[in-house]
Amino acid sequence: LYALHAADGRTLLQVLVSIAESFLAGTPTGIAVDPESCLVFSPSHFTWMDTNYPACTPREGYPIELAVLFAELLRQLARLGVTRSGEPYAVLAQRVVASLALFYRADLGFFADTLHCVAGTPASAAVADDHLRPNQLLAISLGVITDDRARSALSAVERHLLVPGGLRSLAPIGVRYPLPLVGSHGQLLNDPLHPYYGSYVGDEDTRRKPAYHNGTAWGFWLPSYAEALLRTYPKDAFARTAARAVLGSCARALGEGCLGQLPEVMDGDAPHHERGCDAQAWSVTEHLRVWLMLGR
């Protein structure tokens, strides 16, 4: 697989090495790796939560999913025996994994979504928020975190984010780290201490953009929850049954609307009306991937 060629003639392995080294060196767009923690710094609205004008989930600082995916990239390069002139990829990966401790909120039982700071600030000096989002699931589903923290975080996700067919992008609970959303005319669009939006309806800039990643449920995250169940309880037969049941909650959607497809998003509040595009590749391919995994 890694010998396959990308569009520019490089192998996929060469592309992966290029990504890792570009992050470590810093990119012209402001992405950088903190030398101390090896966590990835992201400028405002650079992640998949990228709504802008207004920026409704800016997440400037160290987002948790970037840390996990970077750790997995480094571990994969180490497993493939790729060498470099500086610190080995395996050592860098270990530093990222150790630094995930900066995200864990023992007082809340789940991982902070982002360590907030401006560019040039080390992760150790950033502020961990208390925003419960599904991004932390990657740490569990990819096997980066396997201890009691995984079980606690998974439980929090189940209590506050899980809905039929998807996971809420933000828990419907108050926060202490404020998330103010400011409109194009400088007006405050939300209650910064209660930033959850339960429905994805209304005007695009003042209602739908703020709701898009702040409560709206996303279908592509549901399989990650099922996968995390299996990772966390690998010897529990009930976990596999529960994972199948979770994915099975999408059966109705497959038989309605755009037949054989799954929607992009749905309202975070019941009855969880389907929203966004009728056929979302993220949703379909992730469900298929994990369903096939459950069958093995």
Language model feature labels by segment:
Residues 13-17, 90-95, 155-156, 241-245:
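Beta-strand segments within the central parallel beta-sheet cores of soluble alpha/beta enzyme folds
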